[in-house]
């Protein structure tokens, strides 16, 4: 994939729409379960978006009735009685873990639209997004404990931070599911809406972000991520650095000019 091109694969459609990069899960017969090829394609797309000045926001949606049912375990393990010792530990960092890390660290804001089921890595993909709009009746679920397995793709890192450890235990340990409206009430997702309106609301939010000051939004995203693991003194230094960097942007100058002229700013993402 070149710096300014975006490829699609079976199960994932990626396309650039102005300043918005669209990624649509397109495997409805499998509840949009991810496979290795889809994960690699999405990672490549986010990598390219990080280098492409045209991209100012990413929108992740899904075709069909469900957002993502998790990984396609059956296809992945076809013909194998059990994983070889060490195979999971070797493969996850290059697949599921890389994807969630990329969603968290890409410099432009990411919005996801969830209808139906979001389970396992599907839930983590939505939760790692900067904003998630979920259907009121969406089903957000961690299936691992009911399968005798442990969570992957940063679920045990994301959920306690977003919803608190007590609520996270209900999902991760007991396997309790949440509706979209319940998830919005406790802060696991940004907002909940009627299923028919989810995609439109998520796109409106993504376009709002795509029209924003891209440099400062990216730096704010970085500050919020690293602030979870840094000391206060280090974080204050990071804030000072981010302010210095954002003050050099064209959008900062436009923001000041618009303020003095008493008009709305017209940001260009630079």
PLM regions with names:
Residues 1-63, 101:
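Conserved CoA-thioester-binding segment of acyl-CoA-metabolizing enzymes
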Residues 221-230:
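Short, charged, surface-exposed hinge/linker loops at domain edges
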């Amino acid at each position: 994939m070149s710096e300014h091109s975006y490829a699609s694969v079976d199960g994932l459609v990626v396309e650039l729409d102005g300043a918005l990069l669209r990624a649509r899960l397109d495997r409805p017969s499998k509840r949009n379960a991810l496979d290795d090829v889809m994960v690699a394609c999405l990672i490549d797309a986010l990598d390219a978006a990080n280098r492409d000045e045209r991209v100012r926001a990413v929108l992740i949606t899904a075709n069909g009735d469900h957002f993502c049912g998790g990984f396609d375990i059956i296809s992945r393990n076809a013909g194998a009685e059990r994983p070889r010792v060490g195979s999971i530990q070797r493969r996850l960092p290059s697949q599921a873990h890389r994807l969630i890390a990329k969603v968290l660290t890409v410099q432009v804001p990411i919005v996801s639209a969830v209808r139906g089921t979001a389970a396992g890595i599907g839930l983590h993909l939505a939760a790692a997004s900067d904003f998630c709009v979920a259907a009121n009746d969406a089903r957000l679920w961690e299936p691992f404990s009911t399968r005798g397995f442990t969570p992957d793709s940063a679920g045990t890192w994301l959920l306690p931070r977003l919803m608190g450890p007590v609520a996270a235990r209900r999902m991760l340990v007991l396997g309790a599911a949440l509706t979209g409206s319940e998830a919005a009430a406790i802060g696991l997702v940004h907002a909940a809406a009627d299923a028919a309106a989810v995609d439109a609301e998520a796109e409106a939010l993504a376009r709002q972000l795509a029209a924003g000051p891209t440099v400062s939004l990216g730096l704010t995203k970085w500050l919020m991520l690293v602030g979870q693991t840094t000391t206060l003194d280090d974080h204050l230094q990071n804030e000072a650095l981010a302010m210095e960097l954002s003050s050099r942007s064209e959008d900062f100058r436009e923001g000041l000019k618009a303020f003095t002229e008493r008009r709305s700013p017209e940001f260009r993402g630079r």
